[in-house]
C-alpha cells in the first residue's frame, strides 16, 4: 500500500499500523459528516490505493504521499518524511514543497473556511502537502485544531484528508440516474435507505423515526419535538420533559421524577431504602427484633402510614411461608397493619417483634381502645396457610381494654402441629386476667366452596367488652336478617345446653379443629373450638393438624368442669351443632359427644330437649343488665324473622327451641349473622366465618348499625331475644354445611349476599364488630379474593388454654389473601356514628374490585351512618395506589387493577372462537383479526400487510430490512426454480414428460412448502410480535419508562427480529439447496433412464438383424 507505481518512496523501518483503524475515525472525528460518510470509510482506503496504482495521476488527484498517512499517521515525523520523499518525485509540483510545509502563510490559508477555489485547482497540492504536518497527530492519535482544513464547496463540510473530501463529493454531490438525490439539499445517495435516513437531518429530533413506525397509529403528537404517542397520557408525561415539570417526588430521598413509570420503578426498587417502607411495610433489611416498639398514637388528623411504619419497624419477620404458594411474595408482605381510626391512642409494645408465640404482650391504650387494622397476612391462594393470628388477638384485645395480646398462630399445613401448640400456649393470654382469644383454627374451604373464618372471643368479665360478630357479605350484603345478642355469663346453663347443640351442629359439619366433625368444615370447627372453657375438648386429632391435641389437652382441663364458663361454651357448641342439624344421626351424635367431651347420652338428651322445646326457657333468661346484649334480627331464607334489638323475640326462630349463642355464640363473618354492634359485657366468642351466604345478614337490628350503637348497647333486651338471635346466627353460620337444613332459621353460609343498607360491608368481606364497653366498634373485615376462602376458627376460652384443632376434612385449605381488621372505634356510642375510617390494609378493596360489583369500601359498608360510599381502591397518603401483594405502587387505580392480573392470573377478555383469554381488550381485538383475516396495517414499500400493530411497528422499525430481504429471497428462489427447469428441453420428447412431471412436482412441492414455511414463519412472527406488543402495551399502560429505556427495548427487539429473520433466511436457503439437489438427482435419473432406453433399442435392432440373417 505504501509503495505505488513510482516505487521511489522509502518504507519506514518499523511502520506502526496499530492506529490505522483509528486514524480514519480521527480524521473525521471533528467533522460534521453523518453516517453516510462513515459508511464509505473503507471505500476511501480502497479508492486511495487505486489512485496510487495509476500510472499517471492528475494534479487534482490525491498525491501518493497521502497513502502513507494511514500507515504512519500516528507519528508526525514519519509522515513528514513521507511527504519529503514525495516532493522529490517529478510529478510533484516543485521542490519547494518542504518549505511550504512550514510556511505559516500556507497554514493560515489552509485554515480558511472558504476553500471552494482550492478544488479542483492545482494549488491544492501545496495545501495538501502542508496538511500532514499542520494536522499532525500526537502519539495518542488525537486530532489537532485543523479539523476544517478542507471544506466541501457544496455543503461546507470540513475534512482533513483530501481523499475524504473527494469521496464525499463523489458519493454525495455527483448526481446520476442511479443515485437518489435529496430534494432539500444537493446530497445524493446510492441507496434509498441512506436517503431516507438522511431526511431525518431535515427534521427535528426523532420525528422521522416516530413517523415511520407510527403509520397513523400515534395520534398524539408533541408540538415541541414532533414525537407522536399512541396514548394521550404518554404525551402528557412527555411534555414534562420539555417543561421540566417533575411532579413525583420520592418521600425517602426527595428525588423527583417527571414520569410516573420512573417514579414507580424507583419506589419499588431496593435502591432507595429508608425508614419509610413502601406500602406501609418495612423493608426486610430495616426490620429489627427489638423487644419494644415505639408507641403509636393516632390523632384524628395524623396520617396513618407513618404511624404504621413506627409500629412495624420493630416487628421481626414472621415465619417464612411455605414454598408451595402460588406467588412467592416478599417476606415483609405478611405484616400490613393499618391504623384505621383517627383520634385513638394506642401504645403497642411488641415482644421480640411481632408475634412471639405464646408470649404475652400488654399494651396500654386509651380507654377507647386501639383502633388498628391488622391484616391477616396469608399470602397466596393455595395451601399451605400462613396466618398470623397474633394480629387478630391484638385487635380484639385492644378493642377490649387497650391491652394488646399477640399470639402467633401461623397455620401452615406443613407445620400445623407445632404452630397450634404455640397458639395454645399463647391462647391463654389474659388481659387483666381475662383471656381474649384462646385459639384460632385454620382457614378451611367448605365442600361447596364457601370459606369461613371463625374467631371465638370470650371475656370473663362481661363488663369489659362485648364482641358482636358482624357478618360481612362476601358479595352483596343482604338485608340484615339475623341478629345475635351475646348474653352475660349468667345464662350459662342455657348456654351450656345450647353449646352442646352448637357442638352437635358443628360436629355434623366438619370441624376445623377436629376432623371428627363430618359436616361442614366451616361450621363445625368454629363451634367446637368455640368452647372457651372446653376449647380443649379434645376432639379427635385432625389429620391435617395434630398439635391441636396438645392444645386440646391443655384446654381440655376444664372439659366438664361445673364452672359456668365451660358449660356456657359447651352450650354454645351444642347449639351450633344443633343449628347445623337439628336431627343428627347416631354417628353424628357420637362425633358431637366426642368433640365436646360429653357422654353420648347427655348429648342425645340435650338434642331431644332442644327438639321438644324444653330448653328454650333457660335460654330466654334475661341477660344480666350489666352486659349489653344486642339482638340481631335473624331471618331464615324461607322464614325471615326480623328481630328488633329492642323487641324481645319468641324462642323459636326456626320453629325449634331457640338456641342461645350468647355465651359463646359462633357468628360466621361471611355468614348471615351480623353481631349487632351492641356490646355484650359477657364473654362472647367471636366467630368470623367468611363463608358466602345467600342472604347476608350482616346488619344487626336495623337501628343498631345505622345509629351510633345506642340500641346495640341496650342491655335490657330479654335473653329470649338473645337466644333467638344466637340461634339464628348459628343456623345461618351452618346452613352451608352439608347437614344444615332449609328449616334452619338462617342459611347464610354459601349463598351470595345481597347488599344491605344496614350493613355497609364490602362485597366478599366478612366483618366482625368488636365493641368495647365504650361502644367503640371494631370491625374485622376478612376480604375474600376467590369464591373459596379458608375459614379461620378462633376460640376464646376464659382463663384457659383453648384447644386448637384444624380439621381439613376436605384438605382444601387455602390461604386467605388477606384478612383486614378494621376498627371503627368511637369514644362513645353516640360518637360511633362517624366510625373511624377503615384503611384498607393490603389493598383488600383493590382485590375486591375484581370480585365485587359494588364500589363501597369496607368501612363504608360497615357503617351505615357513614358518608356516601367511597371508591373501593384507596389511595395511599402520597396519592398512589399500592399493590397489596407486592411493593409496586401505581398512579391510577386502573393500572393497579391490570397489575393485579399478574398475581391472580385473571384474563377477563376471552376470544369467543378459540377461547383464548387476554388481559387487555385491545389485545383481544387484534387477536380477533387472526380469525377474521383482517390486516389493516400495510408496508408502503413492500406492500406486506399486518394484522397486529406490533408486527407492523417492528417491520417499520427495521427500516424496510424485511422488504429488502424478502426481495432478495424471492430473486434467489426464482433463480433456483428456473435453473433445473431448463433440463427437460434437452431430453427426448418421450422422456420430457417423464422428466418434467417429477421436476415440476418437486418444484411445486417445494414452492408449496416454501409458502407454508413463509405462512408459518409469518404467523410465528405475528404471534411473537403480538406477545412483544402486549409487553410493550403493559409497560406503556402500567409503567411508562423514560425515552432511553424505550429506545433500548426497541433496539433489543430489532436485534432479536433480525436474528430471527437471518435464521429464517438460512432455513429457506437450505431448503432451496435441498430442492436443487433433488432436481439434480431427478435429472441424473432421467439421464440414466435415457441411456438404458437407447441401449435396449440398439440391442433390439441387433437382434432383428440377426433374425433376418
Swiss-Prot record:
Biological-process GO terms, alphabetical: animal organ development; cartilage development; cell population proliferation; cellular response to amino acid stimulus; cellular response to transforming growth factor beta stimulus; central nervous system development; cochlea morphogenesis; embryonic camera-type eye morphogenesis
Region (Disordered) location: 1-106, 123-143, 278-307, 468-501, 525-566, 614-711, 834-873, 968-1109
Chief location: nucleus
Origin: domain of life: Eukaryota
Localization per record: Nucleus
Compositional bias segments (type: Low complexity): 15-30, 288-304, 1071-1087
Signal peptide: none
ZnF (C2H2-type) intervals: 150-173, 180-202, 220-242, 248-272, 881-903, 909-931, 937-958
Modification after translation (UniProt): Ubiquitinated, leading to degradation in a proteasome-dependent manner. Deubiquitinated by USP51, leading to stabilization.
GO cellular component, one term: nucleus
SMART domains referenced in this protein's UniProt entry, alphabetically: HOX, ZnF_C2H2
Chain positions of cross-link Glycyl lysine isopeptide (Lys-Gly) (interchain with G-Cter in SUMO): 327, 752
This protein's UniProt keywords: Activator, DNA-binding, Homeobox, Isopeptide bond, Metal-binding, Nucleus, Phosphoprotein, Repeat, Repressor, Transcription, Transcription regulation, Ubl conjugation, Zinc, Zinc-finger
UniProt entry tagged with the keyword Phosphoprotein: yes
Crosslink feature (Glycyl lysine isopeptide (Lys-Gly) (interchain with G-Cter in SUMO2)) location: 166, 175, 287, 311, 315, 327, 419, 473, 484, 495, 528, 752
Acidic residues composition-biased segments: 87-98, 1012-1066
Chain positions with Phosphothreonine modification: 680
Modified residue annotations for Phosphoserine: 31, 33, 293, 302, 657, 664, 671, 678, 682
Keyword Ribonucleoprotein: no
DNA-binding region, residue intervals: 559-618
GO MF terms, alphabetically ordered: chromatin binding; DNA-binding transcription factor activity; DNA-binding transcription factor activity, RNA polymerase II-specific; DNA-binding transcription repressor activity, RNA polymerase II-specific; double-stranded DNA binding; E-box binding; RNA polymerase II cis-regulatory region sequence-specific DNA binding; sequence-specific DNA binding
Annotated family: Belongs to the delta-EF1/ZFH-1 C2H2-type zinc-finger family.
Subunit structure, interactors included: Interacts (via N-terminus) with SMARCA4/BRG1.
Function: Acts as a transcriptional repressor. Binds to E-box sequences in the immunoglobulin heavy chain enhancer as well as in the regulatory regions of many other tissue-specific genes. Represses E-cadherin promoter and induces an epithelial-mesenchymal transition (EMT) by recruiting SMARCA4/BRG1. Represses BCL6 transcription in the presence of the corepressor CTBP1. Positively regulates neuronal differentiation. Represses RCOR1 transcription activation during neurogenesis. Represses transcription by binding to the E box (5'-CANNTG-3').
Protein name, entry field: Zinc finger E-box-binding homeobox 1
Amino acid at each position: 500500500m505504501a509503495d505505488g507505481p513510482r516505487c521511489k518512496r522509502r518504507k519506514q523501518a518499523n511502520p506502526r499500523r496499530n492506529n490505522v483503524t483509528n486514524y480514519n475515525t480521527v480524521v473525521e472525528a471533528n467533522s460534521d459528516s453523518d453516517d453516510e460518510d462513515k459508511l464509505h470509510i473503507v471505500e476511501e482506503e480502497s479508492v486511495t490505493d487505486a489512485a496510487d496504482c495509476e500510472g499517471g495521476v492528475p494534479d487534482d488527484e490525491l498525491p501518493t504521499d497521502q497513502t502513507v498517512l494511514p500507515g504512519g499517521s500516528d507519528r508526525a515525523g514519519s509522515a513528514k518524511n513521507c511527504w519529503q520523499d514525495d516532493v522529490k518525485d517529478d510529478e510533484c509540483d516543485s521542490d519547494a514543497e518542504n518549505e511550504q510545509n512550514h510556511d505559516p502563510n500556507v497554514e493560515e490559508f489552509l485554515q480558511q473556511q472558504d476553500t471552494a477555489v482550492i478544488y479542483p485547482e492545482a494549488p491544492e497540492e501545496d495545501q495538501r502537502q502542508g496538511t500532514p504536518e499542520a494536522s499532525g497527530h500526537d502519539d495518542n492519535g488525537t486530532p489537532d485544531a485543523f479539523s476544517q482544513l478542507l471544506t466541501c464547496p457544496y455543503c461546507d463540510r470540513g475534512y482533513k484528508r483530501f481523499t475524504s473530501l473527494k469521496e464525499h463529493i463523489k458519493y454525495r454531490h455527483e448526481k446520476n440516474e442511479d443515485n437518489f438525490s435529496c430534494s432539500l439539499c444537493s446530497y445524493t445517495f446510492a441507496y434509498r435507505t441512506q436517503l431516507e435516513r438522511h431526511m431525518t437531518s431535515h427534521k427535528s429530533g426523532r420525528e422521522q423515526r416516530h413517523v415511520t413506525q407510527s403509520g397513523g397509529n400515534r395520534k398524539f403528537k408533541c408540538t415541541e419535538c414532533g414525537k407522536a404517542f399512541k396514548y394521550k397520557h404518554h404525551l402528557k408525561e412527555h411534555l414534562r420533559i420539555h417543561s421540566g415539570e417533575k411532579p413525583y417526588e420520592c418521600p425517602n430521598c426527595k428525588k423527583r421524577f417527571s414520569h410516573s413509570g420512573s417514579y414507580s420503578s424507583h419506589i419499588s426498587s431496593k435502591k432507595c431504602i429508608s425508614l419509610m417502607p413502601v406500602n406501609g411495610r418495612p423493608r426486610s433489611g430495616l426490620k429489627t427484633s427489638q423487644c419494644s416498639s415505639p408507641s403509636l398514637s393516632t390523632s384524628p388528623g395524623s396520617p396513618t402510614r407513618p404511624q404504621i411504619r413506627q409500629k412495624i419497624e420493630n416487628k421481626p419477620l414472621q415465619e417464612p411461608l411455605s414454598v408451595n404458594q402460588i406467588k412467592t411474595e416478599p417476606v415483609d408482605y405478611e405484616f400490613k397493619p393499618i391504623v384505621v381510626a383517627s383520634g385513638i391512642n394506642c401504645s403497642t409494645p411488641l415482644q421480640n417483634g411481632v408475634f412471639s408465640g405464646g408470649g404475652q404482650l400488654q399494651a396500654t391504650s386509651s380507654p377507647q381502645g386501639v383502633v388498628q387494622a391488622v391484616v391477616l397476612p396469608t399470602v397466596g391462594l393455595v395451601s399451605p396457610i400462613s396466618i398470623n393470628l397474633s394480629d387478630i388477638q391484638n385487635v380484639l384485645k385492644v378493642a377490649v381494654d387497650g391491652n394488646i395480646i399477640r399470639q402467633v398462630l401461623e397455620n401452615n399445613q406443613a407445620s400445623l402441629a407445632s404452630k397450634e401448640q404455640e397458639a395454645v400456649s399463647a391462647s391463654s393470654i389474659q388481659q387483666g386476667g381475662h383471656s381474649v382469644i384462646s385459639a384460632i383454627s385454620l382457614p378451611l374451604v367448605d365442600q361447596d366452596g364457601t370459606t369461613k373464618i371463625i374467631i371465638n372471643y370470650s371475656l370473663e368479665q362481661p363488663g369489659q367488652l362485648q364482641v358482636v360478630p358482624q357478618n360481612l357479605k362476601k358479595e352483596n350484603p343482604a338485608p340484615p336478617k339475623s341478629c345475635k345478642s351475646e348474653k352475660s355469663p349468667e345464662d350459662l346453663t342455657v348456654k351450656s345446653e345450647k353449646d352442646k347443640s352448637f357442638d352437635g351442629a358443628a360436629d355434623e359439619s366438619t370441624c376445623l379443629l377436629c376432623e371428627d366433625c363430618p359436616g361442614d368444615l366451616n361450621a363445625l370447627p368454629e363451634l367446637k373450638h368455640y368452647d372457651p372453657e372446653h376449647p380443649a375438648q379434645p376432639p379427635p386429632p385432625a389429620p391435617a393438624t395434630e398439635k391441636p391435641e396438645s392444645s386440646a389437652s391443655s384446654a381440655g382441663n376444664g372439659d366438664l368442669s361445673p364452672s359456668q364458663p365451660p358449660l356456657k361454651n359447651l352450650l354454645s357448641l351444642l347449639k351450633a351443632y344443633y343449628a347445623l342439624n337439628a336431627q343428627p344421626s347416631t354417628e353424628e351424635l357420637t362425633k358431637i359427644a366426642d368433640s365436646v367431651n360429653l357422654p353420648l347420652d347427655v348429648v342425645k338428651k340435650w338434642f331431644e330437649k332442644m327438639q321438644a322445646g324444653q330448653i328454650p326457657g333457660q335460654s330466654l333468661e334475661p341477660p344480666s343488665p350489666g352486659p349489653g346484649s344486642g339482638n340481631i334480627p335473624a331471618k331464615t331464607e324461607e322464614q325471615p324473622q326480623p328481630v328488633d334489638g329492642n323487641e324481645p323475640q319468641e324462642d323459636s326462630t326456626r320453629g325449634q327451641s331457640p338456641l342461645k349463642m350468647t355465651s359463646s355464640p359462633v357468628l360466621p363473618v361471611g355468614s348471615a349473622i351480623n353481631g349487632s354492634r351492641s356490646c355484650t359485657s359477657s364473654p362472647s366468642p367471636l366467630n368470623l366465618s367468611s363463608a358466602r351466604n345467600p342472604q347476608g345478614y350482616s346488619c344487626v337490628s336495623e337501628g343498631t348499625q345505622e345509629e351510633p350503637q345506642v340500641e346495640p348497647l341496650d342491655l335490657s333486651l330479654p335473653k329470649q331475644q338473645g337466644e333467638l338471635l344466637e340461634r339464628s346466627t348459628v343456623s345461618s353460620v351452618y346452613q352451608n354445611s352439608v347437614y344444615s337444613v332449609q328449616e334452619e332459621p338462617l342459611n347464610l353460609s354459601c349463598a351470595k349476599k345481597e347488599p344491605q343498607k344496614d350493613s355497609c360491608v364490602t362485597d366478599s368481606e366478612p366483618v366482625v364488630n368488636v365493641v368495647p364497653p365504650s361502644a367503640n366498634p371494631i370491625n374485622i373485615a376478612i376480604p375474600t379474593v376467590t369464591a373459596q376462602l379458608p375459614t379461620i376458627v378462633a376460640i376464646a376460652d376464659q382463663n384457659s388454654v383453648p384447644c386448637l384443632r384444624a380439621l381439613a376434612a376436605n384438605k382444601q385449605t387455602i390461604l386467605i389473601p388477606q384478612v383486614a381488621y378494621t376498627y371503627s372505634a368511637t369514644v362513645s356510642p353516640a360518637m360511633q356514628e362517624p366510625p373511624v375510617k377503615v384503611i384498607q390494609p393490603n389493598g383488600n378493596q383493590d382485590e375486591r374490585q375484581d370480585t365485587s360489583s359494588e364500589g363501597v369500601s369496607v368501612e363504608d359498608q360497615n357503617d351505615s351512618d357513614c358518608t356516601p360510599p367511597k371508591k373501593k381502591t384507596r389511595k395511599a397518603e402520597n396519592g398512589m395506589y399500592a399493590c397489596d401483594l407486592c411493593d409496586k405502587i401505581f398512579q391510577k387505580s386502573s393500572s393497579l387493577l391490570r397489575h393485579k392480573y399478574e398475581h391472580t392470573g385473571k384474563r377477563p377478555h376471552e376470544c369467543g372462537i378459540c377461547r383464548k383469554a387476554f388481559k387487555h381488550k385491545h389485545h383481544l381485538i387484534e387477536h380477533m383479526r387472526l380469525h377474521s383475516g383482517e390486516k389493516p396495517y400495510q408496508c408502503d414499500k413492500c406492500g406486506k400487510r399486518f394484522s397486529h400493530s406490533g408486527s407492523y411497528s417492528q417491520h417499520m422499525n427495521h427500516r424496510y430490512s424485511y422488504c429488502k430481504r424478502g426481495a432478495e429471497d424471492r430473486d434467489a428462489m426464482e433463480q433456483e426454480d428456473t435453473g433445473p427447469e431448463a433440463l427437460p428441453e434437452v431430453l427426448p420428447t418421450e422422456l420430457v414428460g417423464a422428466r418434467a412431471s417429477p421436476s415440476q412436482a418437486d418444484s411445486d412441492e417445494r414452492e408449496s412448502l416454501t409458502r407454508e414455511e413463509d405462512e408459518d414463519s409469518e404467523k410465528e412472527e405475528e404471534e411473537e410480535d403480538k406477545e412483544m406488543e402486549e409487553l410493550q402495551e403493559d409497560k406503556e399502560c402500567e409503567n411508562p419508562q423514560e425515552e432511553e429505556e424505550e429506545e433500548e427495548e426497541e433496539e433489543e427487539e430489532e436485534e432479536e427480529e433480525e436474528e430471527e429473520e437471518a435464521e429464517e433466511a438460512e432455513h429457506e436457503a437450505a431448503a432451496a439447496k435441498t430442492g436443487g439437489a433433488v432436481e439434480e438427482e431427478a435429472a441424473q435419473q432421467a439421464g440414466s433412464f435415457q441411456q438404458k432406453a437407447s441401449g435396449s433399442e440398439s440391442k433390439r435392432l441387433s437382434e432383428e438383424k440377426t433374425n433376418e440373417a
